[in-house]
């Protein structure tokens, strides 16, 4: 399973660890992903999405029905 938020599209990015001597070693910054069940009142069922913390805030703001319709328009499975 890829580390991508289904709502926002956030994915891992790369950067550097910096030591006290400012040596740079490559590292990955991972999104804060969670598998979360959301109740969809219109379908009378739970839907499980892999979302970041920001994705959960987007769902709180827009509503789960709006977000699911956007996912359907993109052709993403949930």
Curated annotation (Swiss-Prot):
The gene is rpmB. Pfam families: Ribosomal_L28. InterPro entries: Ribosomal_bL28, Ribosomal_bL28/bL31-like_sf, Ribosomal_bL28_bact-type, Ribosomal_bL28_sf. The keyword Flavoprotein does not apply. GO terms for cellular component: cytosolic large ribosomal subunit. Belongs to the bacterial ribosomal protein bL28 family. This is Large ribosomal subunit protein bL28. Keywords: Ribonucleoprotein, Ribosomal protein. One of its GO terms (molecular function) is structural constituent of ribosome. One of its GO terms (biological process) is translation. The keyword Ribosomal protein applies.
């Amino acid at each position: 399973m890829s580390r991508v938020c289904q709502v926002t599209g956030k994915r891992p990015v790369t950067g550097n660890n910096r030591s006290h001597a400012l040596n740079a070693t490559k590292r990955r910054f991972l999104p804060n992903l969670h598998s979360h069940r959301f109740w969809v009142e219109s379908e009378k069922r739970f839907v499980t999405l892999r979302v970041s913390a920001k994705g959960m805030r987007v769902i709180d703001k827009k509503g789960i029905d709006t977000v699911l319709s956007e996912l359907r328009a993109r052709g993403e499975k949930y």
